[in-house]
């Protein structure tokens, strides 16, 4: 079964993650090091509980809890501005990946705007497969590269 969790502390970007207990025994412990970052220009997080179907940019229902955490953070910190960045793995054409990543970032931005966040506070950008965080040689690496990031910006 899949689980998600969020950690929040005043003055810091929230942290979220997801995990499965399929490969773990019931009696084993799960220990997680949680790196919280101060809310300041340049700080960024991967929104690990944002989900899309393959080659689609419509947000899956499971993403809304995470997005509501972003809305709460923005409401609690009215002076910050953010950029939402979409990223893909390297499967497919570069132009298609760039368009998909931009459309996914815009979908996230659209949800935030629907929750009355000032559009001047949010921007979106699609990077396609140009900024991998892992090797695209394995399925697990590709999964890490398919991500949505939130970065605090100065303008």
Regions found by a protein language model. Name each.
Residues 77, 83-155:
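Periplasmic OmpA-like peptidoglycan-binding domain that tethers envelope proteins to the cell wall
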Residues 10-32:
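Structured interaction patches on ligand/partner-binding surfaces of diverse proteins
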Residues 1-11:
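A short, solvent-exposed beta-strand micro-motif common in secreted/extracellular proteins
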Residues 25-27, 40, 75, 143:
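Surface-exposed coil/turn segments at beta-strand junctions on protein surfaces, enriched
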Residues 39-80, 85-99:
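Short, solvent-exposed beta-strand/turn patches at coil↔beta or beta↔helix junctions
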Residues 3, 30-32, 46-48, 55, ...:
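Envelope-exposed proteins and targeting segments
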């Amino acid at each position: 079964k899949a689980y998600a969790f969020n950690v929040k502390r005043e003055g810091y970007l929230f942290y979220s993650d997801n995990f499965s207990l399929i490969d773990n025994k019931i009696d084993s412990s799960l220990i997680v090091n949680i790196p919280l970052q101060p809310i300041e220009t340049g700080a960024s997080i991967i929104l690990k509980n944002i989900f899309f179907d393959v080659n689609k940019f419509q947000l899956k229902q499971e993403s809304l809890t995470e997005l509501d955490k972003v809305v709460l953070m923005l409401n609690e910190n009215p002076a910050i501005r953010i950029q939402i960045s979409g990223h893909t793995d390297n499967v497919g054409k570069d132009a298609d990946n760039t368009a998909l990543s931009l459309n996914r970032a815009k979908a996230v931005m659209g949800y935030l705007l629907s929750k009355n966040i000032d559009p001047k506070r949010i921007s979106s950008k699609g990077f396609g497969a140009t900024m991998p965080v892992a090797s695209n040689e394995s399925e697990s690496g590709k999964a890490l590269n398919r991500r949505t990031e939130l970065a605090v910006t100065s303008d």
